[in-house]
C-alpha cells in the first residue's frame, strides 16, 4: 500500500500533464467529469481499485479493462493517458492522480471544495444556502460540494473548506457546552 505523501508526489506531475493536455485541447471540464466518474468507480468497487494496484496482473489485462470501461466513444487523449499510466506502471496511483487533477482544476476555475457532513441528506435548497455561505466566506467564484451523512451529528452540519471548519452540529454544540461546564 502506498503512503499518501508518496502517492501525492508521484501523482502531481501526471495530474499537471493531464491538465496541460486538457487545456491545450479545451477539454478541462470534460476530463474533470471523467475523473469524477472514475473516482466514483474506484471508491465504489474495491476490486477495481485492487485490480489496478496489483503489480502481478498483466498490463494488457489492465489496458483491456480501461478500454472496456471507457467504451468506444471515449476521449482518445484521456484513454491514451490512462494506457500510458499502465505502461509506466503508475496506474496504481490513478486515484491520487485524478484527485490532484481535480484540485488543479478547482484552482484554475477559482472553485473551492466544501466538504459538508450532515445528520440527514440535504435538500437542494439547503445545499444552495451552504454554497452561498461558502462563497461569502471564501471569496471563491464557485463551490464544489462533497456531501456526507453522519447520523451521530444528531442535527446540523459541519462544513470544511480547506483548513477552516465550521461546526454547526448539535453534537459540536453539546461538546462545547460540556467543555464550558467542566471549565467553570
UniProtKB/Swiss-Prot annotation:
Q: Which keywords does UniProt give here?
A: ATP synthesis, CF(1), Hydrogen ion transport, Ion transport, Membrane, Thylakoid, Transport
Which subcellular locations apply to this protein?
A: Cellular thylakoid membrane
- State one molecular function term (GO): proton-transporting ATP synthase activity, rotational mechanism
The regions listed as transmembrane in this protein's record are none
User: Which Cys pairs are S-S linked?
Assistant: none
Look up and give the membrane topology term: Peripheral membrane protein
Q: Which Gene3D superfamilies match?
A: N-terminal domain of the delta subunit of the F1F0-ATP synthase
- Indicate whether Ion transport appears among the record's keywords: yes
Q: Which domain of life is it from?
A: Bacteria
Which InterPro entries has this protein been placed in? Answer: ATP_synth_OSCP/delta_N_sf (IPR026015), ATPase_OSCP/d_CS (IPR020781), ATPase_OSCP/dsu (IPR000711)
**Membrane found in the keyword field:** yes
Please give the function described in this protein's UniProt entry: F(1)F(0) ATP synthase produces ATP from ADP in the presence of a proton or sodium gradient. F-type ATPases consist of two structural domains, F(1) containing the extramembraneous catalytic core and F(0) containing the membrane proton channel, linked together by a central stalk and a peripheral stalk. During catalysis, ATP synthesis in the catalytic domain of F(1) is coupled via a rotary mechanism of the central stalk subunits to proton translocation. This protein is part of the stalk that links CF(0) to CF(1). It either transmits conformational changes from CF(0) to CF(1) or is implicated in proton conduction.
Q: What family does this chain come from, according to its entry?
A: Belongs to the ATPase delta chain family.
Protein name, please?
ATP synthase subunit delta
Where does this protein come from, organism-wise?
Nostoc punctiforme (strain ATCC 29133 / PCC 73102)
Amino acid at each position: 500500500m502506498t503512503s499518501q505523501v508518496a502517492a501525492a508526489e508521484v501523482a502531481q506531475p501526471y495530474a499537471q500533464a493531464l491538465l496541460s493536455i486538457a487545456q491545450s485541447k479545451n477539454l478541462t471540464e470534460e476530463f474533470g467529469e471523467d475523473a469524477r466518474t472514475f473516482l466514483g468507480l474506484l471508491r465504489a468497487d474495491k476490486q477495481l481499485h485492487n485490480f489496478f494496484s496489483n503489480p502481478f496482473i498483466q498490463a494488457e489485462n489492465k489496458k483491456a479493462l480501461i478500454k472496456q470501461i471507457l467504451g468506444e466513444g471515449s476521449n482518445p487523449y484521456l484513454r491514451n493517458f490512462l494506457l500510458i499510466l499502465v505502461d509506466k506502471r503508475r496506474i496504481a496511483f490513478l486515484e491520487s492522480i485524478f484527485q490532484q487533477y481535480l484540485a488543479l482544476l478547482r484552482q484554475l476555475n477559482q472553485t473551492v471544495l466544501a466538504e459538508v457532513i450532515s445528520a440527514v441528506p440535504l435538500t437542494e435548497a439547503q445545499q444552495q444556502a451552504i454554497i452561498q455561505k461558502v462563497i461569502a466566506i471564501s471569496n471563491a467564484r464557485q463551490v464544489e460540494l462533497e456531501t456526507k451523512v453522519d447520523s451521530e451529528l444528531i442535527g446540523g452540519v459541519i462544513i470544511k473548506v480547506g483548513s477552516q471548519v465550521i461546526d454547526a452540529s448539535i453534537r459540536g454544540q453539546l461538546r462545547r457546552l460540556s467543555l464550558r461546564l467542566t471549565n467553570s
